[in-house]
Amino acid sequence: MRTTMTMDDGVQFGLGAFETIAVERGKGILLSRHLARLGRSAQFLGLGDLAERGLTMERTAEWIGENCPEHSACKILLTQENLMMRLRPNPYGPARYARGFRMDFSAVRRNETSPLTGHKTLNYGDCILEHRAAAAAGMDERIFLNMRGKLAEGTVGSLFLVSGGRIYTPACEIW
């Protein structure tokens, strides 16, 4: 996998997409869903077809199996001219979930009318700044609301409600 980047619109202006995939025992959790979402974003942003760029389910699963430790995270970053995959430790595990997460609400609002809504793009600066501010305030995460005051997402995490054995998350259509 390449470790240098070409200065394209993704690097210069954030017109790229990414996915972060939890890895357990050498397998990407919900890998097909992550790749499908990345593929939709790639098409929307004009980044091309994933398979034509060599990012198939089989090759991605193989790379994860060969390179990812037991409990880790794999980040795929895609721009017009760049495709990179990297590993990092996954800070989330049973002990962290048992402890729970301290959260508060961000004063920054998500713009539900943005064409980028629903895509994990490289336009992520506000998320990182708000996540750092949350940590400085003793929080683990900060929650974004949309312009109408409805739940949107976390700074670096997804929002889930577990009820009756089912998992729910805010749909783009409602925010």
Which residues make up each language-model segment?
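Helix-start/capping segments and mature chain N-termini
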Residues: 1-62, 79-175
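Short secondary-structure junctions
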Residues: 65-72
